[in-house]
């Protein structure tokens, strides 16, 4: 795996992971740091639309379909009978950037911040996981690691950038 700075955002469902990643991308790119994201999906997903040419290519058996336009390109790789690739296998497919924010991949070994909302009714992951370096919560918590207000995007960005060496 090439040298890439990676930082994760993990937490139980409905604890604000995606919203935090979204705000962090805006905040960090606004500071001149290039960012890509990697999102783990626990379910089948499809970026394509039935009936479109690219969908027809995939349904006909194409292993990969590369869709390009003047605005963006997207590569769809069909796993078929292959096992799900790990995080490191996917990271090498990204173009070089300063930082990759990863949403999900709780059990991977990279450093992470956990999102926590009291209303979600779930316990914290952090106490049993040393890779979780901080928690972003909507309620005050007493922990053995930094705790941020979930809405303190600037403070969380400062922490992450410091953690990865910026």
Model-identified regions with their sequence ranges:
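Glycine-rich phosphate-binding P-loop
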Residues: 7-29
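N-terminal phosphate/diphosphate-binding loop that engages ATP/GTP or pyrophosphate donors
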Residues: 23-88
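Phosphate-binding P-loop
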Residues: 1-4
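Phosphate/Mg2+-binding loops and adjacent switch elements
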Residues: 99-166
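Fold-independent oxyanion-binding glycine-rich loops
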Residues: 12, 40-41, 50, 69-70, ...
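A generic local secondary-structure boundary/capping motif
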Residues: 25, 91, 122-125
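Phosphate-binding/switch loop-helix module in NTP-utilizing enzymes
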Residues: 78-105
